[in-house]
């Protein structure tokens, strides 16, 4: 069962994921050709593609990796770099709390297949990722990737060192001890499986810690730019954008002609 209609993923992020797969040795281009998979923008929303297409792509691609925990491994390899602007904003926020708030604000630039929120209980902060992916295999590895990225951000973002003291996974534990140890070694803390949500737990006081090399002025400029991007992407596609998309599709299909362009417009 795929994600429901209305969920989407940034095409820019999809391309970065494909490049990451190539770097890891996956025959990405061969798989794209074999399954006739194309990066097709959503009509009226040219910066994104349907999440169900991306879920299928991940289902195929992740299974090509010999690693039993491909999502976790890709998280280790990519660190925060995959998130581009979001990661850069995080690095320039003044505190851990401000950094996490900025990521939550900008999450829609990446996708709406998951939503991050920050909740508090006495003495503890919980960074929760609500996942809308239905395919159990894909959900397992995307969830592992997301939580590893958040854990690294919190643990390496300040002078305090290791802050995350527990991680919850909303999928079953691996059956063999060796794979379970990989999880625990990667997160360097207890990992709880079959939890209700994907969750990273750390001291509530950590949200007020200063972030390494924070630059509040640069953060303000970048935040304003990111907000403009969000506003622009929320607008309906213009006639020019629609025309560009149609022509790109014709180019991909090898059917470019004056008649075909006129017919699509």
Spell out what each predicted region is:
Residues 1-127:
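N-terminal low-complexity or simple alpha-helical regulatory segments
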Residues 9, 138, 142, 214, ...:
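Short, contiguous, pocket-lining structural segments
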Residues 20, 30-31, 153, 183, ...:
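Residues within well-ordered alpha helices
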Residues 29-30, 140-141, 259:
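Short, solvent-exposed positions on alpha-helices
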Residues 37, 81-204:
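N-terminal regulatory/effector-sensing and dimerization cores
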Residues 58, 147-150, 247:
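Hydrophobic alpha-helical core bundles mediating ligand binding, dimerization, or RNAP-core interactions
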Residues 182-265:
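Extended mid-to-C-terminal alpha-helical interaction segments
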């Amino acid at each position: 069962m795929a994600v429901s209609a209305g969920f989407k993923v940034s095409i820019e992020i999809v391309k970065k994921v494909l490049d990451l797969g190539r770097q890891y040795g996956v025959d990405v281009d061969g798989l794209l050709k074999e399954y006739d998979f194309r990066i097709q923008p959503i009509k009226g929303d040219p910066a994104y593609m349907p999440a169900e297409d991306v879920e299928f792509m991940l289902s195929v691609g992740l299974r090509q990796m010999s690693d039993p925990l491909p999502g976790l491994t890709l998280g280790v390899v990519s660190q925060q770099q995959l998130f581009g602007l979001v990661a850069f904003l995080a690095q320039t926020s003044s505190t851990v709390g401000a950094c996490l708030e900025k990521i939550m604000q900008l999450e829609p630039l990446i996708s709406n297949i998951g939503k991050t929120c920050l909740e508090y209980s006495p003495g503890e902060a919980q960074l929760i990722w609500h996942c809308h992916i239905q395919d159990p295999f894909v959900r397992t590895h995307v969830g592992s990737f997301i939580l590893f990225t958040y854990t690294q951000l919190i643990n390496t973002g300040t002078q305090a060192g290791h802050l995350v003291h527990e991680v919850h996974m909303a999928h079953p534990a691996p059956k063999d001890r060796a794979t379970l140890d990989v999880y625990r070694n990667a997160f360097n803390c207890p990992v709880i499986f079959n939890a209700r949500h994907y969750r990273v737990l750390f001291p509530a006081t950590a949200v007020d810690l200063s972030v390494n090399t924070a630059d509040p002025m640069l953060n303000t400029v970048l935040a304003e730019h990111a907000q403009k991007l969000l506003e622009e992407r929320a607008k309906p596609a213009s006639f020019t954008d629609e025309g560009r998309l149609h022509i790109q599709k014709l180019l991909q299909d090898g059917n470019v002609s004056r008649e075909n362009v006129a017919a699509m417009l």
